UniProtKB/Swiss-Prot annotation:
The active site is at 312 (proton acceptor). Monomer. One of its GO terms (molecular function) is S-adenosylmethionine-dependent methyltransferase activity. Keywords: Cytoplasm, Methyltransferase, rRNA processing, S-adenosyl-L-methionine, Transferase. It comes from Histophilus somni (strain 2336). It catalyses: cytidine(2498) in 23S rRNA + S-adenosyl-L-methionine = 2'-O-methylcytidine(2498) in 23S rRNA + S-adenosyl-L-homocysteine + H(+). Pfam families: FtsJ, RlmM_FDX, RLMM_N. S-adenosyl-L-methionine binds at residues 193, 226-229, 245, 265, 283. This is Ribosomal RNA large subunit methyltransferase M. GO terms for cellular component: cytoplasm.
């Protein structure tokens, strides 16, 4: 196994290929990315044996922007028999036992790409998981007592009779099958954009810290808030929100008594002087560098402590633009000797955008 399989949103394969190549090179690992446009994944092939495993351990998954999952995989296994796909899969894993401790495996995920073409395979993957898991347990696999330090086995079907076989490290991978969190749209939310902020909070904020970072003692500003999809996520967590937008906010949010609607331009709005703002959130449709400059201003001036915002990406040179915007923010903060934590992710509910989280330390 000397390849990495990385999942992504369909159409972002080139960005992911550029990112993984850059990360690998920084670690002294060289290889090449196999990219099929709109396939929903990238295969990165290393030149030296053992280097794919090295990357899976050394690249911090949470620092990858466009990857939904990070898996060490085999060569593509083709022409699997419809009558028996399980036996050759088990045999391949057996051949890896000298270098891979399968008794440290905790689960098996059968996956496919997140594309319209692959949707027909998704149902098969779910059904195939049950007998495959049973067969693996008979081998003495999937028995890891400490899941956090174990591995997850992956079968990634590119066709119904072709798959990559591999594994990921539980302490350095996405926690969801296919890297996709399953969130339910709340009926009372004003817009579907609410799922973007919900996913961002679940991704960036540790579960055991959420109640202390979002509660009735916290204040937030939502720039470009109308009709209130992002404001809703803050209000339901108890936060008081200054909702900034010339448009109307949902009546249901006004009825909570936890918002103040400020009919102003998000770029000109200034925080109220009578309270300290804990959170700034922003999902305005604007040039990414303009948003990066706006967020930098809020952070440098100390107008907020934490922020979650989206950068809308151009049609071309998207990875280049992301890097430039993030570097722009980092340079502004470093110039002022401000300590900070920053993460960026192309979340499942994002489309032509990425979500960025910054916390002042």
């Amino acid at each position: 196994m000397n390849k990495l399989a990385l999942y992504c949103r369909s159409g972002f394969e080139k960005e992911l290929a550029a990112e993984i190549t850059e990360k690998a090179t920084a670690l002294g690992v060289f290889g090449f990315a196999r990219v099929v446009e709109n396939s929903g994944y990238v295969i990165f092939e290393c030149y030296q044996i053992g280097e794919a495993d090295l990357l899976a351990r050394k690249i911090t998954f949470s620092q990858l922007i466009f990857a939904r999952q990070l898996i060490v995989v085999s060569d593509l296994i083709s022409n699997l028999s419809v009558q028996d796909r399980i036996s050759p899969i088990i045999e391949y894993y057996r051949q890896q036992e000298k270098i891979l401790n399968l008794k440290q495996s905790s689960d098996i995920w059968v996956e496919t790409a997140d594309t319209n073409e692959a949707k027909t395979r998704a149902a098969f993957c779910r059904k195939f998981t049950v007998p495959l898991r049973q067969a693996f347990r008979k081998q003495g696999w999937l028995q890891a007592k400490n899941k956090k330090s174990g591995i997850t086995l992956h079968i990634f079907f590119t066709q119904s009779n072709s798959c990559y076989i591999g594994y990921s490290y539980n302490n350095n991978h996405a926690e969801h099958i296919m890297g996709i969190p399953r969130l339910k749209f709340p009926a009372e939310a004003p817009s579907r954009s609410t799922l973007k902020l919900e996913e961002a909070i679940l991704y960036f904020i540790p579960p055991n810290q959420e109640a202390t970072r979002f509660n009735e003692n916290k204040y937030a500003v939502d720039l470009g808030a109308c009709p209130g999809g992002w404001t809703y996520q803050l209000v339901r967590r108890g936060v008081f929100v200054y909702a900034v937008d010339h448009g109307k906010m949902a009546t249901s949010l006004h009825e909570t008594g936890r918002i103040e609607h400020c009919a102003e331009d998000g770029f000109k709005f200034r925080p109220p002087k009578h309270c300290k703002i804990d959170w700034l959130v922003c999902d305005m449709v604007e040039q990414p560098r303009r948003i990066a400059d706006l967020i930098s201003q809020w952070l440098v001036k100390g107008w907020c402590k934490e922020t979650i915002f989206n950068l809308k990406l151009p049609m071309k040179k998207r990875y280049f633009e992301v890097k430039r915007c993030l570097q722009q923010i980092k340079e502004r903060l470093n110039e002022q000797h401000i300590s900070f934590q920053i993460q960026a992710k192309h979340l499942y509910h994002d489309r032509e955008e990425i979500t960025v989280y910054i916390r002042l330390m």
